[in-house]
Amino acid sequence: MQVLHVCSEMFPLLKTGGLADVIGALPAAQIADGVDARVLLPAFPDIRRGVTDAQVVSRRDTFAGHITLLFGHYNGVGIYLIDAPHLYDRPGSPYHDTNLFAYTDNVLRFALLGWVGAEMASGLDPFWRPDVVHAHDWHAGLAPAYLAARGRPAKSVFTVHNLAYQGMFYAHHMNDIQLPWSFFNIHGLEFNGQISFLKAGLYYADHITAVSPTYAREITEPQFAYGMEGLLQQRHREGRLSGVLNGVDEKIWSPETDLLLASRYTRDTLEDKAENKRQLQIAMGLKVDDKVPLFAVVSRLTSQKGLDLVLEALPGLLEQGGQLALLGAGDPVLQEGFLAAAAEYPGQVGVQIGYHEAFSHRIMGGADVILVPSRFEPCGLTQLYGLKYGTLPLVRRTGGLADTVSDCSLENLADGVASGFVFEDNNAWSLLRAIRRAFVLWSRPSLWRFVQRQAMAMDFSWQVAAKSYRELYYRLK
């Protein structure tokens, strides 16, 4: 079984979000599971530099100009690169310029990505062609449409990592992207009078997956579907929509082997976690005290992530004696709010604006509770890292958070399935009730340790996801 992942970023070469983590880990897990998985990416500068052994496979003149298809390897995974400097050789973000304006030629830059994905199924590389083209998010959404236009030379899977980003472009660009105008239709890629790359993926793919079972269910509901609910309800009825939970890359995220931690530990040596907490308290300017629970946030600071709720609930958390360490950037109003809290509560609140991958590991190793109060969360990786590190996740019951964290209710504790704290309602009061439960459990150290050990024993390895995808691919054949 030969599978081509079509996407725009891959950890650690280029990362703007969780999509990169998935592409950095899933193909390798699939190869270990017996699937011949390869990845197709635009040759953005950071990616081009990382794939050092790239050789020319093919050269083509396309609707988006001249391109060279390269093939090389990264960490044992075969990587195809679309080398088109006039489109991709730009510094910084792959999607927008330094002023945060989307590039005006994004329609061509990402239509080309989908086009090459479909061409691969028609023999662009004479020595390897995919049985399944697996496209990820709107950037690759046209791949299933180009396959449909070519009579479907391969099966297609489209994975939704976040339905909020829809890849919308003016209708007149149908003239530029080499798809029949008949595709510009409500039964096609048209959405609100524009081209939607996301809808192209949803409409033309043989199967749609979302990155968790709960998110797959939620996106059939109006409040999560951004106008796509009709199509997604239909795909659900046809059995063409399912959820496959993302995994954790254990080569990168494991407290037993994580060289970024001051002290490594396992579920049997949890006492060694304490040194990480001490170091984190020092680094964040917090009072060094192992008796108080240290809550943490590692997140984009946006209302989608529910960080306004944390700001509102913060006085209640601090009154009970807790500490907060925050790493993130985003909404200027939220940034100012957290910086003001750090100034008002020195020694209790530590804030670092920005994102540093290495420091996120130190927070995960040192904190007692990781807060993920998202309004919606397709899968969420932060809570999975928390479970892995014995840093109990406190989450809102939505998307992948609902699938992965079980509340420390009395019955869950009795049944041995408790792994964190879960709240229902989208408000600070509901969040504060969960924070209160965390303090109550904290006051019973042996019970806290019991829940940590349960959390760390859970299996969210990529092998599980790789097996689910393999079964899906074979069902499509």
Curated annotation (Swiss-Prot):
It comes from the Bacteria. Disulfide bonds: none annotated. One of its GO terms (biological process) is glycogen biosynthetic process. HAMAP family: Glycogen_synth (MF_00484). Synthesizes alpha-1,4-glucan chains using ADP-glucose. It comes from Shigella sonnei (strain Ss046). GO terms for molecular function: alpha-1,4-glucan glucosyltransferase (ADP-glucose donor) activity; alpha-1,4-glucan glucosyltransferase (UDP-glucose donor) activity. It holds the Pfam family Glycos_transf_1. It catalyses: [(1->4)-alpha-D-glucosyl](n) + ADP-alpha-D-glucose = [(1->4)-alpha-D-glucosyl](n+1) + ADP + H(+). Keywords: Glycogen biosynthesis, Glycosyltransferase, Transferase. Its EC number is 2.4.1.21. InterPro entries: Glyco_trans_1, GS/SS, Starch_synth_cat_dom. ADP-alpha-D-glucose binds at K15. Belongs to the glycosyltransferase 1 family. Bacterial/plant glycogen synthase subfamily. This is Glycogen synthase. Pathway: Glycan biosynthesis; glycogen biosynthesis. One of its GO terms (cellular component) is cytosol. The keyword Kinase does not apply.
